Amino acid sequence: MSKTYRYFCRQFLNAGLLFVGSTLLASAQDADYQLDPAQTSVKFTLDDVLHSVHGTFKLKQGHLEVESDGKMSGQIVVDATSGDSGSGMRDRKMNKEVLESARYPEISFRPDRIEGPVAGSGKSSVMIHGMFNIHGADQEITVPAQVETDADHWTAAVHFTVPYQKWGMKNPSTLFLRVSDTVEIDLIAAGTVARHTAQSTQ
């Protein structure tokens, strides 16, 4: 093996180690994630025997902090009174009889840990654990999230099921129309991200 060949092998190996090291360092950084209400959507789907009802809620605010050891803090707050399924009568019934949104005007999620690294750039698949508060009660959940980040922007897609009847809310079924006792939630979050290391916070 020639000296030139060995030299190029060492250079290639060093470059690879440098790339891996910088990637691990980026993923280990603490990060603050802001949710932009204008770019974030909260959709729900409720099935009945005839069709599926689709609707939306509005995000009030959202801020998440992710530490390099996987700890999370912050919260996502949704306006429970903003539910819109395209039917005023159905929405009034949902607010009055199911969500009781006059009494419980907010739905929130307070994460406490994340499982899996979030890449400094590109796509990541993680699991997020925390407390989901709806109808005035905390429920422990773990949800999958597909996260994509670049230099200063991020998006995340989250899907999970809310067993609302099991969690103490009224099932709006009638004698002639039976609906599911669970509702599907799809959150598409987007906003800005700021990363910081120990050196940058001094």
Language model features: what each stretch is:
Residues A28-Q202:
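Low-complexity, acidic/polar, glycine-enriched regions of mature
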Residues G21-L25:
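N-terminal signal peptide c-region/cleavage motif recognized by signal peptidases
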Residues L13, L18-V20, D47, H54:
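Residues at the start of alpha-helices and the adjacent loop-to-helix junctions
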Residues S2-G16:
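Bacterial N-terminal signal peptides that target proteins for export
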